[in-house]
């Protein structure tokens, strides 16, 4: 995703400067062309040689370095950059950028750079909360620079509060969001459902299924990276939240129905990959049901058909994609579901196929629309997600 991309990292004087070495290493491992510019104060916290070793490029500090090959360095780097991140960003560099001051290599390059700029403030909590600093950050936002909100915690100065630079893994996600993919879904609002639902029997037990949510989370991530405004309605799963996605946690099928039906009118696309219970206990015990002699029967009642409801209430320009997991007659059963629920697309897979189904990192699916069927090879779930999004994008262009 990041191969061949040029990332310029700006490092200012902060105890958090050492963490950027880890970020540079992460980017280089993804085959990024990484360049680092440091302020003079930053060199008191980490030696430029560390960055030169990691990136295989000279770390720039002095605008007038006579030992560096002349390309008007701040201009050449600014033109090459796909994205520029300043982290940690001191109150000083924030003020310089806000007021157009270019008096060192970093500030000069930043002002000459037309690529997206991501700023990660790191400072004492009282400095960060100072109205002057906040005004300067708002100026940067006005000029379309993205501000990474600092983490809250114990600071090097001994205070506790906002001001900590987020971990390198978080900063990496900001860079990934910006340059990993072409933004062909920009402006689209996409709702994705993922994971299982849980239908309580009593306070201890519930009815559920084997869904892990991996497919839905992969779709949400890829849609976000491609520029969509994504809402992820998720059942209980053991997955980390998808960054930069609106998360709506649910437990029961009724919870999911309310979340989807309430949010869908504002969406362009619904991709419903969640494994929702078709039935729930008709009566839920307030106390734990005790074991007794003999058998026990649980009366079940139907849950609301979410796809059926949405299919009946969708606008002509909206697109609905459902999922169909089968163990037999996959194509026939999936096409029936497509027609009955008024879907535009259904993603079908066979649970009995190796590498397809619950809990795996791969899937093998067939995309079924009214006019055609497109069978895909076994691939990663993120690759499947892109295939689904590509297909929907083509359908959207026809509508």
Predicted regions span which residues?
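A cross-family phosphate/adenosyl-ligand binding-site feature
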Residues: 1-118, 124-213, 217-399
